[in-house]
UniProtKB/Swiss-Prot annotation:
Protein name per the record: Proline iminopeptidase
Database matches in Gene3D superfamilies: alpha/beta hydrolase
Keyword Iron set for record: no
Upper taxonomic lineage: Bacteria, Pseudomonadati, Pseudomonadota, Gammaproteobacteria, Lysobacterales
Enzymatic reactions: Release of N-terminal proline from a peptide
Amino acid sequence: MRTLYPEVTPFDHGMLCVDDSHRLYYEQCGNPHGKPVVILHGGPGGGCNDKMRRFHDPDKYRIVLFDQRGAGRSMPHANLTNNTTWDLVADIEKLRVALGITRWQVFGGSWGSTLALAYAQTHPEQTTELVLRGIFMLRRWELEWFYQEGASRLFPDAWDRYIAAIPPVERHDLISAFHRRLTSDDEATRLAAAQAWSLWEGATSCLYMDQDFIASHENPHFALAFARIENHYFVNGGFFEVEDQLLRDAQRIANIPGVIVHGRYDVVCPLQNAWDLHKAWPKASLKITPGAGHSAFEPQNIDALVCATDSFV
């Protein structure tokens, strides 16, 4: 079974100004003359971490990571202004041009898979391959499954902690109820809602519960960006024209090679998502990891993702 590549440090990093207010942190690792790949983090709002550098062979790949608008080290932190899917798609292109890259592989999981599909369908000529994990397409049923009723029946203990932040009278629409608190003028209200929202996802992302991973979701800096930006996208339907836009436009990536990795026991983004995408994009190979959940860092997901990236060099 494959494991992550050894730790690697960036050979370049900086801040890219993408509009009058947003500045994005980016970094480059691996071989400056290698095959380019851009890593798209989840959330939206999750930001990059050092382990995300390690799915690609650093001797063969030029590995580009960046924090999307409002996330991680990008500024302004947790900001929702001019923060849409299509702003992020444009940002990826601005980063590609700024780094002098002609075409690149696009790698992303969860929300990163959403953004990767949106980017590749908009810029297929610039996309050499797609390596996707934990498919998420922001359809209404997907949001209701995780944030209203569905996953709640598998994790009732974590669910009760999640909904404790919302009075019973508002629980018929939890995404909207959290939105009111995450956009409150009161800092304490925003933080309490952000931590409840973030801990719910942290508690459900792994097949075997990882207490350190869960605790990391309570960090105020992480939680505020993660919850505020996620919720902002969800109340706006991902800023898509129709909820199944990524499936509707799958023909635009029909000839792009790809690998879809999805955990059989992914509670955050059910396997149905990957199945639907694979039927719409048969050129991609689908790898269902039989003993994994949602997290990219579960052993079987790591193995499948590293095998996928190795196959393209």
